[in-house]
């Protein structure tokens, strides 16, 4: 049985919600803790790097846990739901920091940010791993992957377009207050989106997944030159995206300067976000039909 339009839409809604959360953290956590709360830039940057290195080991470990999971609700949905709820709570805590100073704020940021990464991985790994378990044919798997990636792009674009507008509208002159309300709004959307996804998309089979230890995974990676090339290119692409999303707001604030920098930043983000949505919803599916995976990549 092929996936219904309703199921594909529900899976896409899940992608929108989870990438809204990811984009909010990836694009604004440095600005929030450095410019709004006043932590040293070197410290914030160091914690971001440490968190990414930690993720490199945490992600495969999470994959092993998911593969070994057996529940009456399936292998993936319990992780998606529990990870979503936990991550939503941590996201709010990340952008609703208590009034602390100096070392106390540094400790708070370090713990909460790394915890955010752990809880996000709890739902992100099983979300994408669920695709083979909810589809029966290669065509269905391909279509669902396209839906997921397209909608994920929409989610991140929405954050780029509306975050600073909402921060100003909800917080007035206080960016600290504005970010707290935006985080709460995004967290609620996130939970609702994943609930819709898990309620509509259910596993159709319980095929056994051959598990490997984290050490075996890294050994297999480093013994495969083609896999290393792919992983290396992904690292470079994600590094470029991460740097751009984190630093573009500083370009507008300190290079454009003046009282109107937020308007300029919002205009830029709106145009870029709209272009991203258009590309993901129109251009990407068309190119996917015209080109092979390798050529498209």
Indicate residue ranges for each PLM-predicted region.
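Membrane-embedded alpha-helical bundles of multi-pass transporters/translocases
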Residues: 1-297
């Amino acid at each position: 049985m092929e996936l219904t339009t309703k199921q594909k839409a529900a899976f896409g809604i899940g992608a929108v919600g989870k990438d809204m959360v990811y984009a909010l953290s990836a694009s604004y956590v440095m600005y929030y803790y450095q410019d709004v709360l006043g932590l040293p830039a070197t410290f914030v940057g160091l914690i971001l790097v440490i968190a990414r290195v930690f993720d490199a080991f945490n992600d495969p470990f999470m994959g092993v846990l998911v593969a070994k999971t057996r529940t009456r609700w399936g292998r993936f949905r319990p992780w998606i739901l529990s990870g979503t709820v936990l991550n939503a709570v941590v996201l709010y805590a990340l952008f609703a920091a208590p009034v602390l100073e100096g070392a106390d704020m540094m400790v708070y940021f370090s713990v909460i940010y790394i915890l955010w990464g752990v809880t996000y991985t709890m739902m992100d790994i099983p979300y994408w791993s669920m695709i083979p378990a909810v589809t029966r044919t290669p065509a269905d798997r391909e279509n669902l992957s396209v839906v997921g990636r397209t909608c994920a792009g929409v989610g991140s674009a929405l954050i780029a377009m509306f975050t600073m507008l909402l921060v100003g509208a909800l917080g007035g002159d206080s960016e600290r207050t504005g970010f707290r309300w935006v985080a709460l709004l995004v967290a609620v959307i996130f939970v609702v989106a994943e609930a819709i996804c898990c309620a509509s998309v259910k596993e159709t089979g319980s095929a056994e997944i051959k598990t490997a230890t984290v050490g075996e995974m890294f050994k297999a990676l480093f013994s495969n030159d083609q896999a290393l090339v792919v992983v290396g290119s992904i690292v470079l692409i994600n590094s470029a995206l991460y740097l751009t999303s984190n630093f573009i707001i500083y370009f507008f604030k300190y290079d454009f300067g003046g009282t109107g920098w937020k308007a300029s930043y919002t205009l830029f983000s709106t145009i870029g976000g709209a272009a991203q949505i258009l590309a993901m919803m129109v251009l990407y599916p068309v190119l996917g039909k015209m080109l092979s995976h390798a050529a498209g990549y």
